[in-house]
Amino acid sequence: IEVLLGGGDGSLAFVPNDFSIAKGEKIVFKNNAGFPHNVVFDEDEIPSGVDASKISMDENDLLNAAGETYEVALTEAGTYSFYCAPHQGAGMVGKVTVN
C-alpha cells in the first residue's frame, strides 16, 4: 500500500491515515508535497514485543523532496500508531491495523 505524506491540498496529513494490511505487506510512505516529513512509530502504541526503533525512521531523518519514500513491512498482527515527528503537533498522525 502507498501512503502519501502530505495531502494534495497541502494539508499536513498521512493519506490514508487509517488503514489495514496483511501481515508482512509492504507499506510505502511517499512524500507528496516537498515539505520535510518522516515516519515514526509510537513505542507505546504498537504490539508488545515490537521494537519501534527497527520499524521507524530516525526522528532526525527526513524525506525532504516530493517522491522520496520510506518502506517498511510489519510482521506482527495488531494496531500500530505512527506520526511525523516535525508535524505531530499539527495532527499528522496515523494508524495501521495488521491482520
From Swiss-Prot:
SUPFAM superfamilies: Cupredoxins (SSF49503). One of its GO terms (cellular component) is chloroplast thylakoid lumen. It comes from the Eukaryota. GO terms for molecular function: copper ion binding; electron transporter, transferring electrons from cytochrome b6/f complex of photosystem II activity. Residues 1-99 form the Plastocyanin-like domain. Signal peptide: none annotated. Cu cation binds at H37, C84, H87, M92. It is found in: Plastid, Chloroplast thylakoid membrane. Its main location: plastid. The keyword Glycoprotein does not apply. CDD domains: Plastocyanin. Its cofactor is Cu(2+). It is a peripheral membrane protein. Keywords: Chloroplast, Copper, Electron transport, Membrane, Metal-binding, Plastid, Thylakoid, Transport. Belongs to the plastocyanin family. Participates in electron transfer between P700 and the cytochrome b6-f complex in photosystem I. This is Plastocyanin. It comes from Capsella bursa-pastoris (Shepherd's purse).
